[in-house]
């Protein structure tokens, strides 16, 4: 059968759920999220891993990069059923957020990719990768009670994945939403030139 973890991501402030983000098979989990945003704001992510312990003794930590730069994830709670992390980022404009347990492209190329337009409240799956992922435009009451209650994190974990990530920062990051806007601007300029010629 192979290893089948469950991995879900909740954008708390946007009330959005990214469900079944984990690979169909394999000891790896992560995704790419393109954030389309026109104002400065903090964004809170709750990351829920439900490990398949059948073939592993320890779950890999979840790491995060914002526009290629390493950020901190806080371990809130760890039980037999689930491992819950929290990540808070500050964005001033469009951004790329990457969650990952591995850096090997054998795995990361199979991660799903999402576009979250916070201005228009539109949410899209750009690439399913090797997953059955889907988006809920809300966080269910069941998930709120299981993962977002105030007593989550009372164990006092201070663990962070920031120091464990020894990979170099990447400067060349491709932003889907930025490229899309640039293409639209170029099309508008061409239309204006044609109107002037007429």
From Swiss-Prot:
Top-level lineage group: Viruses
Stored InterPro entries: Poxvirus_C7/F8A
Single Gene Ontology BP annotation: viral process
Biased composition (Acidic residues): 156-171, 178-198
Location of the region described as Disordered in the Swiss-Prot/TrEMBL record: 153-198
UniProt-listed Pfam families: Pox_C7_F8A
Family: Belongs to the poxviridae C7 protein family.
Job description of the protein: Plays a role for multiplication of the virus in different cell types.
UniProt-recorded name of the protein: Probable host range protein 2-3
